[in-house]
A protein has these predicted regions:
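Short internal beta-strands
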Residues: 15-22, 126
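A glycosyltransferase accessory/donor-loop signature
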Residues: 10-12, 148-268
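Residues at the starts of beta-strands that form the adenosine-phosphate
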Residues: 13-16, 53, 97
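A short acidic, often aromatic-flanked loop/helix-cap motif at beta-alpha or helix-coil junctions
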Residues: 59-68, 132-133, 196-200
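Short Gly/Pro-enriched turn/cap motifs at secondary-structure boundaries
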Residues: 75-76, 135-138, 169-172
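Histidine-anchored nucleotide/phosphate-binding helix
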Residues: 1-11
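GT-A fold catalytic core of metal-dependent nucleotide-sugar glycosyltransferases
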Residues: 56-62, 79-130, 138-140, 145-148
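Active-site-proximal specificity loops/subdomain of glycosyltransferases
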Residues: 24-25, 30-89
């Protein structure tokens, strides 16, 4: 769903990296994407632009390291940590920028605007976290969307290593996000909220992030429902949005096509 939103709104060629891994020692449900699935996803995004492509980054080799992490038993899966293990070979193969996006981020415009944002000499571009900026620190950022300056990321590899070490040894709330905030303190350019809108759709929202949202009325609770959940009415009721309805319909049709071993095609 995130990929179709991205591909349908972006005119430029997309070079997509999907990070995955088998972590069955941690949880029997932590199964990597396979080649058949990736090939099907690539066919989907090529519907929008034949030059779009996908590369699979399988990080199953990290299982033992993640098993020994102090943060392995948090509510966050090991997949949230993998953005910190993208290696130099990948960064070196990319010109200028790498845009990381969580699977629950949806684009509502051409991503070129965000990709070309001026980072003013900083290594990372991030949006402040909707909850953490009030409860943790005013400049605490959300890691669901990270814009990397590739050259500076390679030059500042020590900060990546520092973040990995913190995840391995220091118990943290939201470990991946907190480690990034600490390791890259003073090296993050704060981006406008429209590039990672965590609360609700606004008129200028470019990237909507359907992460957990803390609500206080009628009682304190967290909204966790995602666009791909089976109960669409629950999504409408809790998120109070219908902007994803067409994308949900398109995605459900692609899922049906995949299950029936059909070639993907776009419904009207």
């Amino acid at each position: 769903m995130s990929l179709t939103c991205l591909a349908s709104n972006t005119k430029e060629d997309l070079n997509v990296f999907i990070i995955t891994g088998n972590f069955l020692k941690i949880n029997s449900g932590y199964v990597a994407f396979n080649k058949k699935e990736i090939d099907f996803l690539e066919k989907i995004i090529k519907i929008y632009n034949p030059n779009n492509r996908i590369t699979l980054l399988d990080m199953s080799c990290l299982e033992d390291e993640l098993m020994n992490s102090t943060n392995k038993n948090t509510k966050f899966t090991p997949y949230t940590l993998l953005r910190l293990y993208i290696d130099d070979e990948v960064f070196s193969s990319i010109d200028n920028r790498l845009l990381y996006m969580d699977i629950d981020t949806m684009c509502f415009g051409d991503i070129k605007e965000l990709y070309n944002f001026d980072l003013k000499g900083k290594t990372l571009g991030m949006v402040r976290d909707n909850v953490g900026r009030h409860w943790i620190h005013k400049n605490y950022c959300n890691a669901g969307m990270i814009l990397f300056d590739v050259d500076k990321t390679i030059a500042n590899k020590d900060k990546i290593i520092k973040a990995r070490e913190m995840i391995r040894t220091v118990k943290m709330f939201m470990p991946d996000q907190t480690a990034i905030n600490r390791a890259f303190k003073d090296d993050i350019e704060f981006l406008p909220s429209k590039y990672n809108e965590q609360n609700k759709m606004e008129k200028d929202t470019l990237v909507r992030h359907y992460c957990g949202v803390l609500k206080f009325f009628p009682y304190m609770h967290i909204i966790k429902v995602k666009p791909w959940d089976d109960d669409i009415e629950k999504f409408h009721k809790q998120r109070k949005e219908h902007v994803m309805d067409k994308s949900i319909e398109i995605t459900n049709e692609f899922v049906r096509q995949y299950k029936n071993n059909e070639e993907p095609y776009l419904i009207k």
